[in-house]
Every structure is written in C-alpha cells, then in structure tokens.
Amino acid sequence: MQASIIICACAIPNKAWVRRDGKKYSDVDVAIAMDHLVLAATDVGLGTCWIAAFDPAAAREVLGLPDSVEPIAFTPLGYAANQLGNRRRKTMMEIVKHERWQD
C-alpha cells in the first residue's frame, strides 16, 4: 500500500458517555467512527487496516496530544500496491454462538 495518509483515531475519555456500571464508552465510540471510515474508504477503492499495536506514549509525543486525549488506533489510507489472494475465512459456525457460549 502506498499510504500518503495515516489517521490516528483518538478518544477523550472524560467526555465519554458512561454506562451504569461505570464503563466509559470512548473506546467503543472511536471504534464505531473508525469502522465507518474504513467502510467509506473501501467504498471508494482505498485500502486501510487497523493498527492497534503501537506505543501510546510515543504516539502522544509525536502527535502532541494532551493528557486528556487517548490514541486508540491508527490506519493508513491509500491504494493497495497489489491484490491479495483469497484467504480461508472462518465459517459462521466457528464465530457465532447461539443463545449461550459453548466451546
């Protein structure tokens, strides 16, 4: 991929909606926004991929993020250098559970 743009999706946890049990939804909200970005990019022929394995402190420093802003994920945005071949996908039976979790 020739990515001329790399997007860092960030959250502001202290402004997030909070569920009754105290769970802040900032990471979920960022994931929803990132998913929409990936779908829109794919729709116009651009390639993307989620990058969540990064050093948050280094990202904060490079991007000049204040302490109140949390980097959640990155994605490059560009045109694929070549087409990937078909990969084996898991079947629905491998990933969907019915009514109760069972291994």
Where do the protein language model's features map onto the residues?
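Hydrophobic pocket-lining residues that define ligand/cofactor binding sites across diverse proteins
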Residues: 41
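Structured binding elements
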Residues: 45
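Short, charged/polar surface micro-motifs in flexible loops or helix N-caps
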Residues: 12-15, 56-57, 81
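C-terminal helix-cap and adjacent tail motif
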Residues: 73-103
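Short, electropositive alpha-helical surface patch
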Residues: 59-72
